[in-house]
């Protein structure tokens, strides 16, 4: 499985700028991931906080041998947001992951990546996007293993990369309305960035007081954490080329090393799960892959 590469997805949450800068410094110096995705993908209002750190972070990651990819917004409503995506896609010598169709025109004819928010669910969609320059697809996390197998079977013919999320809370939906602001009796325009008070998202509970989902500004995620360590060998056999780890408020160096050790054959999937549990991460889910309810965890008999 050594040909399969680890990637670190973009930070979905509103972390303080200095905390993000320091986080990426550690990733550059200590993490075994091959590729790092940067950029604000959830809320354009958060973008100015980190923009002035971005050139230095890109330079440091590149110096450490990481492939750096800039991810676009996934929710585009305003003209300035369309302009942000257009400007990003037109930057020379810059790898871009598109998470909204607003970026397709600007990126057409140039190599670019398609992010999980683009909802590429079948091989014909992948083929059409590849004709326009897409050379890498991060698949939606709710896809089953059987569907991923069909998508991955086209990878060689299309000469594209296939990426699947293997760790972290699962992005499920995004809205024009801000759930975080509403939860604090604020409007979206006057949110005062209250989402920053929950650096791993705000848990939503059922009427029975059971944890159900997580909100992150305008985004909805799973409450439980995806852990696909037991499925990695199957993914590699299917032709999945990249495995995505999503950043959270835990020791991400330990998380990425746990998966890297498994890819290199130094540990088992069970070892990975034990190491993650030791970091107080969980409970775990992997239901989507097995075509059952996504919030469930399927254990092989």
Regions found by a protein language model. Give the residues of each.
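A cross-taxonomic marker for long C-terminal extensions/tails that follow the last structured domain
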Residues: 132-135, 141
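Active-site pocket-lining/capping segments in soluble small-molecule metabolic enzymes
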Residues: 1-120, 124, 138, 145-301
């Amino acid at each position: 499985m050594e040909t399969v590469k680890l990637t670190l997805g973009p930070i979905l949450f509103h972390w303080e700028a200095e905390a993000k800068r320091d986080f990426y410094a550690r990733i550059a110096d200590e993490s075994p991931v091959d590729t790092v995705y940067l950029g604000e993908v959830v809320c354009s209002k958060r973008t100015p906080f980190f923009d002035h750190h971005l050139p230095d972070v890109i330079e440091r990651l590149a110096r450490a041998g990481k492939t750096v990819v800039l991810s676009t917004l996934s929710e585009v409503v305003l003209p300035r947001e369309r302009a942000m995506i257009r400007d990003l896609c037109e930057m020379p010598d810059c790898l871009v992951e598109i998470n909204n169709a607003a970026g397709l025109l600007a990126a057409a004819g140039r190599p670019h990546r398609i992010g999980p928010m683009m909802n590429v669910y079948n091989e014909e969609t992948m083929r059409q996007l590849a004709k326009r320059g897409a050379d890498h697809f991060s698949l939606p996390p709710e896809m089953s293993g059987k569907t991923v197998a069909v998508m991955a079977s086209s990878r060689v013919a299309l000469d594209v990369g296939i990426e699947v999320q293997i760790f972290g809370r699962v992005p499920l939906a995004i809205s024009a309305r801000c759930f975080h602001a509403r939860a604090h009796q604020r409007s979206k325009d006057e949110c005062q960035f209250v989402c920053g008070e929950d650096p791993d998202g705000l848990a939503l509970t059922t009427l029975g007081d059971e944890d159900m989902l997580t909100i992150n500004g305008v985004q909805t995620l799973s409450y439980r954490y995806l852990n696909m360590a037991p499925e990695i060998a199957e993914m590699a056999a299917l032709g999945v080329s990249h495995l995505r780890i999503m950043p959270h408020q835990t020791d991400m160096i330990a998380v990425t090393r746990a998966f890297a050790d498994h890819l290199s054959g130094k540990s088992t999937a069970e070892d990975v799960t034990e190491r993650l549990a030791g970091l107080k991460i969980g409970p775990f889910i992997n239901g989507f892959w097995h075509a059952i309810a996504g919030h469930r965890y399927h254990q092989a008999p």
